[in-house]
Design a protein with these regions (language model features):
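Short, histidine-centered active-site or binding-site loop motifs used for metal coordination
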Residues: 24-26
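Non-catalytic scaffold segments within catalytic domains of secreted glycoside hydrolases
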Residues: 1-2, 7, 11-16, 28-204
Length: 204
């Protein structure tokens, strides 16, 4: 409710781009509704109008650690492939609503955190009776699939859209020269960078 003051101060400092995130739950409170919540969309309409007044370009994150709780409880978050369709519907609403208003999009915040912070990043609660790695990599696959669909849909709606995602960068180094440490480092780096590889190459 203080965003107008914040944006005015932001403009006073001379910034030209503001990264902000749209709350999935504001647009689809449960996540599986047929129609979006108009009041939620109106809130962001007003935010973007305020940014335009100050000639500030919005850089919008579609999903930033913020999933409708119902989707987590009912479907297990991105462990379920059904989440891809829920995300597609949500992203499509945003791309259509803000065509010509938002030109820069991030599909997911720190997409590779799916393997590190599964509940926060993918709405996944690990089932102790199932293989943990399998659950994590299934969720990662579904998130990458959802992201790819968003890029496709976003460009179909507005070919001028620039769409990517946020990656939690970092490099692992071996503790010693021992082969086990070196191999562990390779594995850790692979787990992080394969998220970029898939999106750049289009395959695993």
């Amino acid at each position: 409710h203080r965003y107008k003051e914040d944006i005015a101060l932001f403009a006073e400092m001379g910034f030209k781009v503001l990264r902000l995130s749209i709350s999935w739950s504001r647009i689809f409170p449960r996540g599986d509704e047929e129609r979006p919540n108009e009041k939620g969309l109106q809130f962001y309409d007003d935010v973007f109008k305020e940014l335009k007044k100050y000639h500030i370009e919005p850089l919008v994150t579609i999903s930033h650690y913020d999933f409708p709780l119902y989707l987590v409880k009912e479907y297990g978050g991105f462990k379920s492939r059904k989440m891809v369709d829920f995300y597609k519907k949500y992203a499509t609403v945003l791309f259509k609503r803000y065509k010509g208003i938002v030109h820069y999009w991030l599909t997911f915040n720190e997409i590779n955190d799916t393997l590190i912070l599964p509940y926060l990043s993918a709405g996944v609660v690990i089932d102790p009776n199932e293989d943990k790695e399998q659950q994590l990599y299934n969720a990662a696959h579904h998130i990458l699939l959802a992201s790819a669909w968003a890029v496709k849909i976003g460009h179909e709606i507005d070919p001028t859209n620039k769409i990517g995602n946020m990656f939690a960068g970092g490099t692992w180094y071996p503790y010693t020269c021992h082969p086990q440490d070196v191999f562990a480092t390779i594995t850790k780096n692979r787990d992080a960078f394969f998220f970029c590889d898939v999106q750049a190459r289009g395959y695993y």
